[in-house]
């Protein structure tokens, strides 16, 4: 991607990133597959596997915008969570649900943070290609469907200890209180599932929702915990690479980055608003079908080209 990237292209990519980052369909997998399937200049300019691609600087702005959308949508939760975190440090113990939820997010973020520092560039350069991305997208669909199947088998047993007052409690704060009842080790396991999202085609939100379902959470609570977990890691990934945005890779694309970031923010906000309502009554199955079909069809298309 060079300075000739049009504003229309920047807005389209930004909007696509904002939606696919939060929908359980893998933003990285689509970022690899869509340019390859479209071909032409898109395949050349929008490469995530090239080590010095300006597209990587563009993606930094989109990540920061997506994280900002999550912070705005969940701002009440983050006020309570941050207050709980600092309160626990001050008192040197965990006393309230907000304090416990804060530490669940901390311990759930550490594994993927360390893995990302060690493996992100390796995975992106070696696996950030169309065929691996299509294969992992297919596997993502299988994982989402398997999560639903296992959820139906274990739900009657798993829901009792994890969510004792689920039918009586309603609202965002009630959901946070239910999440705070998770043992810390379960928070680590659910958060560690994000490591798989370093693979192009595996969805961060999808795999953490599946992990939450396997550990006895409802769809609503699993999705909420997934989005709360995603916020610090997406923000950290963007902030960590901000020097690339203001370095040589970002030269000449400032306007496009701004346009794409605005589109990403708006679409990410609308996406999380929709999904938090969707998972109150619905499941991962439609996304599983989409990923399996899209991944399988992409493999066939790439093989026949």
Curated annotation (Swiss-Prot):
Annotated TM spans: 18-38, 55-75, 103-123, 130-150, 187-207, 225-245, 246-266, 284-304
The protein's enzyme class: hydrolase
One BP annotation, GO: regulation of cell shape
Membrane topology listed for this record: Multi-pass membrane protein
This protein's record includes keyword GTP-binding: no
Enzyme Commission number, as recorded: 3.6.1.27
Keywords of the record: Antibiotic resistance, Cell membrane, Cell shape, Cell wall biogenesis/degradation, Hydrolase, Membrane, Peptidoglycan synthesis, Transmembrane, Transmembrane helix
Catalytic activity: di-trans,octa-cis-undecaprenyl diphosphate + H2O = di-trans,octa-cis-undecaprenyl phosphate + phosphate + H(+)
GO cellular component labels: plasma membrane
Annotated localization: Cell membrane
GO molecular function, one term: undecaprenyl-diphosphatase activity
Additional facts recorded: Bacitracin is thought to be involved in the inhibition of peptidoglycan synthesis by sequestering undecaprenyl diphosphate, thereby reducing the pool of lipid carrier available.
Family designation: Belongs to the UppP family.
Function: Catalyzes the dephosphorylation of undecaprenyl diphosphate (UPP). Confers resistance to bacitracin.
Listed name of the protein: Undecaprenyl-diphosphatase
The organism of origin for this protein: Mycolicibacterium paratuberculosis (strain ATCC BAA-968 / K-10)
């Amino acid at each position: 991607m060079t300075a000739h990237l049009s504003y229309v292209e920047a807005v389209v990519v930004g909007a696509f990133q904002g939606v696919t980052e939060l929908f359980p369909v893998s933003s990285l997998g689509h970022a690899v597959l869509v340019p390859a399937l479209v071909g032409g200049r898109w395949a050349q300019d929008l490469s995530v596997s090239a080590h010095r691609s300006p597209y990587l600087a563009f993606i930094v702005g989109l990540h920061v915008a997506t994280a900002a959308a999550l912070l705005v949508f969940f701002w009440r939760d983050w006020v309570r969570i941050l207050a709980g975190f600092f309160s626990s440090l001050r008192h040197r113990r965990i006393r309230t649900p907000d304090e416990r939820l804060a530490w669940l997010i901390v311990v759930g973020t550490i594994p993927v943070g360390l893995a990302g520092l060690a493996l992100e560039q390796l995975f992106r350069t070696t696996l950030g290609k169309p065929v691996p991305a299509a294969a992992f997208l297919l596997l993502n669909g299988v994982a989402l469907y398997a999560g639903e199947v296992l959820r139906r088998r274990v739900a009657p047993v798993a829901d009792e200890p994890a969510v004792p007052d689920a039918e009586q409690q309603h609202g965002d704060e009630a959901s946070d209180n239910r999440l705070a009842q998770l043992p810390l080790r379960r928070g680590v396991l659910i958060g560690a599932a994000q490591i798989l999202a370093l693979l192009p085609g595996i969805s961060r939100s999808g795999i953490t929702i599946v992990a939450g379902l396997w550990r006895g959470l409802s769809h609503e609570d699993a999705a909420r915990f997934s989005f709360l977990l995603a916020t610090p890691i997406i923000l950290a990934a963007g902030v960590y690479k901000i020097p690339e945005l203001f370095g040589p890779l970002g030269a000449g694309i400032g306007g496009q980055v701004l346009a794409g970031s605005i589109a990403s923010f708006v679409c990410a906000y609308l996406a999380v608003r929709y999904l938090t309502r969707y998972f109150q009554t619905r499941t991962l199955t439609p996304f599983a079908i989409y990923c399996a079909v899209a991944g399988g069809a992409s493999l066939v298309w790439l093989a026949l080209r």
